[in-house]
């Protein structure tokens, strides 16, 4: 093996990167009806118009924190793939234990 570390499948010299879609305002993908459905599931009857943007910003911060912790677990284990257990442990670390996905 030529010093490529674990699972050295690296053939060639890297080459050109494929086209990648530029990620910009993906938080708008959480649509107004989707937020309404989540609120309905939580027992909400009427929703103020200002709620939607606020919900998106709170959700974005929450996901950033969970993903940051999950990626930290992944990097510590010297992996490149985030597993469901990484997410479970990240949620547990934040005091939001999730059952049903192992661990």
Curated annotation (Swiss-Prot):
Cystine connections: none
Regions recorded as binding DNA: 17-21
GO cellular component term, pick one: nucleus
Modified residues (N6-acetyl-N6-methyllysine): 6, 13
Superkingdom as given in the UniProt entry: Eukaryota
Keywords from the UniProt entry: Acetylation, Chromosome, DNA-binding, Methylation, Nucleosome core, Nucleus
Keyword Acetylation listed: yes
Quaternary structure and partners: The nucleosome is a histone octamer containing two molecules each of H2A, H2B, H3 and H4 assembled in one H3-H4 heterotetramer and two H2A-H2B heterodimers. The octamer wraps approximately 147 bp of DNA.
Name of the protein in question: Histone H4
Gene it is expressed from: H4.1
């Amino acid at each position: 093996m030529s010093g490529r570390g674990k699972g050295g499948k690296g053939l060639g010299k890297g080459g050109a990167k494929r086209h990648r879609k530029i990620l910009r305002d993906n938080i708008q993908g959480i649509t107004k009806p989707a937020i309404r459905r989540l609120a309905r599931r939580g027992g909400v009857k009427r929703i103020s118009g200002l709620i939607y943007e606020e919900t998106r910003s709170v959700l974005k911060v929450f996901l950033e924190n969970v993903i940051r912790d999950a990626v930290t677990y992944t990097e510590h284990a010297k992996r490149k793939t985030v597993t469901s257990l990484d997410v479970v442990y990240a949620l547990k670390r934040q005091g939001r234990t999730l059952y049903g996905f192992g661990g």
